[in-house]
Amino acid sequence: MDKSKRHLAWWVVGLLAVAAIVAWWLLRPAGVPEGFAVSNGRIEATEVDIASKIAGRIDTILVKEGKFVREGEVLAKMDTRVLQEQRLEAIAQIKEAQSAVAAAQALLEQRQSETRAAQSLVNQRQAELDSVAKRHTRSRSLAQRGAISAQQLDDDRAAAESARAALESAKAQVSASKAAIEAARTNIIQAQTRVEAAQATERRIAADIDDSELKAPRDGRVQYRVAEPGEVLAAGGRVLNMVDLSDVYMTFFLPTEQAGTLKLGGEARLILDAAPDLRIPATISFVASVAQFTPKTVETSDERLKLMFRVKARIPPELLQQHLEYVKTGLPGVAWVRVNEELPWPDDLVVRLPQ
C-alpha cells in the first residue's frame, strides 16, 4: 500500500471514531436528577382464572380474547342437562317426602283420637267399677245380717271383679294408644328429615346450575381462551384467563440505597416504550423486604449496595377506568421515583395522559 492510501485509511478511521463519539454523546441517556431514581420495568396485572366448579362439558363461550368484561357478566356456560334432570328428580323426592309427612300427621291425629276414645272408656269403666264396688260393699253388710242370699253376694263380687278387669283393659288400651302416638311422631320427624334432605339436594343442584354460568369476578379483560366449546373438563378445569384491570402495576428493581428510602404510597411516574410522550402517575404499593438477587459474595459496603429489591408502582384504579382501551400488560418501560420526596417533579416528569 502506498503512502497516500495509508493516509486515506487513517483519515477514514479517524472520521469513524469521531462519528462514534458524536453519536454516543447525542444518544447517551439523560442523567438522573439528584434525589430521583429510575429503573426499567414491565406493566403487569393480577391474573384471574375462570374455571368450572364441577366437572362437565363446555356448552358455549360468549367472549373473545381481548374483550373487556364487567363484574358479573356471563363469560361461558357449561352443559347443564344432567343437572336439570337431577334437579327434577330432587323436586320429585321433595314432593314424595312431603306426602309422607302429611300421611304421618294424619296417622298421628288418628292415634290421638283413639287415645281420647280409650281415655273416655277408662273413665266409663272407672265409673262402673265405683258403682259395683259400692254395691258389693253393701251386699257384704246385708249378707252378714242375713238380709240377702249368699248367691246375691257372689254375683255382686263377680260384677266388681269384672268391672275392675274391664278398667285395667281400658287403661292398657290407653297406654297402647299413647305408644302409637309416639311412633307416629317419630314417623313425622323422619318424613320431615327426608323433606329437608331432598330440599338440600335440590338447593345444591340449583347452586351447581347457577355456577355453570361462569361469570367475571371483577372488571377486566379476557387474555386468552384455555378451552373451547365441547371440551370436557374436570372439576376446577380452566376455561378462560383474564386480567384484573383494577390492579395494574409496573414491577422494577432498585438497589439498596434507593429502595431503602421509599415508602408505601409514595409517588412514581411511569413512561412506556410504546407511549414515550405520556407520563403516567402511580403510587408505590410494594417494596420487597428481602433482596431479590445478590452477588455471589457480599463482603464490602459497595457490594451491599448492589443488592436489588423488587418494587411495585400501582396505577390508580380510577385512572385505569378512564383509559381502559390503553391498558395492556407486558409493555416495557421505565419507572421514576423520588428518593427525596421534598423535591418537586421535573418538568419532563409532569403527568401527561392521553386525551
Curated annotation (Swiss-Prot):
InterPro entries noted in UniProt: CusB-like_dom_1
Entries under SUPFAM superfamilies matching the protein: HlyD-like secretion proteins
One matching Pfam family: CusB_dom_1
Region (Disordered): 128-155
Disulfide bonds: none
Keywords: Signal
Leader peptide range in chain numbering: 1-19
One GO cellular component term: plasma membrane
Record-level GO BP terms: transmembrane transport
Protein name stated in the entry: Uncharacterized protein YhiI
Organism: Escherichia coli (strain K12)
Gene it is expressed from: yhiI
